[in-house]
C-alpha cells in the first residue's frame, strides 16, 4: 500500500418529494449509476476544504449557488480501499429553495421517494451511505464516518472531544 488517495464529494438534495439523485453518464468512476445530484473529484486547492469542492461541483454541474440551497451540511465521510488507492467520499445533504428547477451537465436528475432510493443502483459506498441515511441519518443531525468493506460499511458518529 503506497498511500494513494482519491478524494471525492457529492451532494444530495431532499424535500417533500424525497431525494434527488443523478443518473451519471460518462464518469470515470461511477458511470451509468445513481449518485448525488452533483459531485466529483477534489481540485488541488480544495484538499483541505470539502465544502469548497461540493460548491464548485454544484456550480459546474447544476448552475447552482450556495445561496439557492438551505441547510447544506456534511453528513457522511466514507473510506474504501479500491485498486490500490484509498477512496474518501464526502457526502453533503441540503434542500433546494422553493421553486428552483435543476438541469445537470453530467446526466439525468430524478426525484425518488425515500423507499425507492434504497433500491437504486449506486456505487457501493454510496449505496451503504444511502441505506444508513434512510434508516438512521435522516432522523438526526450527526456527522457519520464509515469504513467500507466487502460485507458492508460500519458507520459511527463523529463527535468532537477534549484530549
Predicted ranges, named:
Residues 136-163:
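Charged phosphate-binding loop/patch that engages nucleotide di/tri-phosphates or the phosphate backbone
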Residues 65-75:
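A short coil-to-beta-strand element that immediately follows conserved catalytic motifs
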Residues 102-132, 157-161:
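NUDIX/MutT-family hydrolases
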Residues 13, 91-95, 111-113:
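Short, well-ordered beta-strand micro-motif
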Residues 7, 33, 86-92, 110:
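Short beta-strand micro-motifs in enzyme catalytic cores
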Residues 1-21, 41-43:
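Conserved N-terminal beta-strand and adjoining loop/helix that marks the start
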Residues 18-56, 153-163:
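Conserved Nudix-box catalytic region and its N-terminal flanking loop in Nudix hydrolases
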Residues 17, 77-100, 131-132, 136:
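Active-site-adjacent beta-strand/loop module that shapes the phosphate/pyrophosphate-binding cleft
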